[in-house]
Amino acid sequence: MSASIADNVAEAQLQAEVLTKALPHMQRYDDAIVVVKYGGHAMGNDELARHFAQDIVLLEQSGVNPVVVHGGGPQIGAMLEKLGIKSEFAAGLRITDKATIEIVEMVLAGSINKQIVGFINEAGGKAIGLCGKDGNMVRARKATRTIVDPQSHIEEVVDLGFVGEPDTVDTMVLDQILGRELIPVLAPVASAVDGGTYNVNADTFAGAIAGALGAKRLLLLTDVPGVLDKNKQLIPRLTIDECRALIADGTVSGGMIPKVETCIYALEKGVEGVVIMDGKLPHSVLLELLTDHGIGTLITR
C-alpha cells in the first residue's frame, strides 16, 4: 500500500471514529428541540457564519429540531449611524423611539434574517425566516428598567421606548414547521400587547421561545467561553442556586447577569439545560452538543 493510500485510509478511519463517538449524542437529541441564540462576533464573519449554518443543517439532518434566534445589535448600530441617528443605551438596552423601531425591524427581520436563511439554505438546509410578529408568535409588553443616579444615588425608572419583554408565546406556527425538514430562523421583533411593535433582547426572546417549546437545550452563543469564576476560568456546570449565588457575590457581573437570568428563566419554564458558550469557535454548536464534555457552561435546575 502506498503512503498516500495509507494516509487516506488513516484519515477515513479518524473520520469514522469521530462519527462513532458522536452517535450516542445524536441519539440523545433525536427528535429533540434545540434553540440556538446566534449572535456576537460570529455573525459578522462569513466563514464562521458558514460553519454555523453547516452545524444547524447537520443537526436537522441528524433528527434534531433546531430553532435559530438571532440578534443584530452591531448591524442595527451601523445602520443608525449611516442614517445619522445617534444610539442611546440605558441598563444595557438600546433606547428605541418610533423612528428607530422601524429601522430595527427592517435590519433584524429583513437584512440579517435573510442573510442567515441564505447561509443555511446554501449549506443544504431549508430555512424559513420569521419574526415574533408572524402568527402573533410572541406578544410583548413594554420593558422598564431602573438605574441609580451616580450623584444622588436615587433610583430612576428609564423609559426605553419601543423595547419589550415577552408576555405570551404562541407556538402554533413553529409546531407546524418543526419535524418537516424546515429550520425556523427567528428575528426578535414582537407584536405589542397594546398594538405596534417592540424590539426584544435576543437572549430574552430565545429563552421565551425555548421555554414555550419545552426545548431540551438552549444554546446562547456569545463572545466569551461561558461563565467564568473569579480567576477567569470557565465553570463547566452550574445549577440555578449556584448561579444566583454567583450574581450575589459579584462573580457574575455586567453583561453576563442578564444572560444568566435568561438561563434561569428558561429553566424555570421547562427547558432541560441551557449553555452559555463561545460562538467564535468554528463548529461550536457541534462541539457543544455532540462531544463528551461540550465547550461552554451548562446550567441546569
Swiss-Prot record:
Substrate binds at residues 72-73, 94, 199. Its EC number is 2.7.2.8. GO terms for biological process: arginine biosynthetic process via ornithine; L-arginine biosynthetic process. Disulfide bonds: none annotated. It holds the Pfam family AA_kinase. It catalyses: N-acetyl-L-glutamate + ATP = N-acetyl-L-glutamyl 5-phosphate + ADP. Pathway: Amino-acid biosynthesis; L-arginine biosynthesis; N(2)-acetyl-L-ornithine from L-glutamate: step 2/4. One of its GO terms (molecular function) is acetylglutamate kinase activity. It is found in: Cytoplasm. CDD domains: AAK_NAGK-C. SUPFAM superfamilies: Carbamate kinase-like (SSF53633). The keyword Transferase applies. It comes from the Bacteria. GO terms for cellular component: cytoplasm. Keywords: Amino-acid biosynthesis, Arginine biosynthesis, ATP-binding, Cytoplasm, Kinase, Nucleotide-binding, Transferase. It is an enzyme of class 2 (transferase). The record marks 37, 259 as: Transition state stabilizer. Catalyzes the ATP-dependent phosphorylation of N-acetyl-L-glutamate. Belongs to the acetylglutamate kinase family. ArgB subfamily. PANTHER family: N-ACETYLGLUTAMATE SYNTHASE (PTHR23342), N-ACETYLGLUTAMATE SYNTHASE, MITOCHONDRIAL (PTHR23342:SF0). This is Acetylglutamate kinase. It comes from Azorhizobium caulinodans (strain ATCC 43989 / DSM 5975 / JCM 20966 / LMG 6465 / NBRC 14845 / NCIMB 13405 / ORS 571). The lineage of its organism: Bacteria, Pseudomonadati, Pseudomonadota, Alphaproteobacteria, Hyphomicrobiales. The gene is argB.
